[in-house]
Every structure is written in structure tokens, then in C-alpha cells.
Amino acid sequence: MLPHRPRAYAQLAYHIFNIADAFLEHEVRSLRLDEGAYDRVPPPEMNTKAKIIAYGQDVLRRFRLWWDGPGHAPNLSRKALVYYGNVTVHEFLERTTWHCGQHVRQLVMVLDIMGIEPDRPPSEETFAGLPMPDKVWDDEGS
């Protein structure tokens, strides 16, 4: 289990990919982001590292298709259909980006605790301009 969270490592990896997938559901399938969307867990058949990695690669592939197509020049000022308030698609995309980034920071910290050197870890510049939380975990000491 993860420190500070009742979540397994695989669930964290899935969650990172699913955050971006929820954005794509909004943009590609016109689905509203409902409360609980970020609480999804991997389906039972997604029970190996390889399957979670394949899901992440599929999300990345679909995001690139969106970005290079309709996402290349979308109307980012239009209202996003999300549970957490009156925001634009630009704000939703920004939140999606830093939300994924925050969990990547958590995963990197877990790897560090386990003595595993991550491949291409994010740097401060990776998140420049984003409203990233100061702490990696909400309940971290100062």
C-alpha cells in the first residue's frame, strides 16, 4: 500500500492514466466529469503490470490523436461539464495536467523509498507554471 493513502501501487498508476482518460471522455465523447470519476479502480481483468502499462499507452495514444486533431485548436474558453464548478475547458485541462503530475510526484517518491531510480523523473521545470501543491502528500509534515 502507498504511504499516506489506502491505495495500492497499481491503483496509483491506473489513477494517473485514468485522470487523463476522464479528460478525453469529456472532449472526445462529450461525457460530463461526474463526482467519483477520479475514484475509479482498475477493472478485474486489468490485473498485471503489463495490462496497466498497455492502458496508459492507449490513453497516451488517444490523447495524442486528440491533441493533433480537435485538441490542436479547440475553443478552450468554452464551459467544461465537470462536477466541481464553473470552469473552462482550459482550466479543466490545466487541472488534469497538474493532477496527473501530482500523482507522478507521489509515484517517484515511492520509487525513491524503494530504492528504485526512475527513468526520466520530472523536474521542477516539468511543472513550471502549474499550480502544483508544495507537498507531495496532503498530510506530509512541514
Short names for language-model regions:
Residues 1-5, 51, 71:
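Proteins with a high burden of low-complexity, intrinsically disordered sequence enriched in S/T/G/P/A and R
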Residues 44-59:
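A short, structured beta-strand-centered segment in the mid-to-C-terminal lobe
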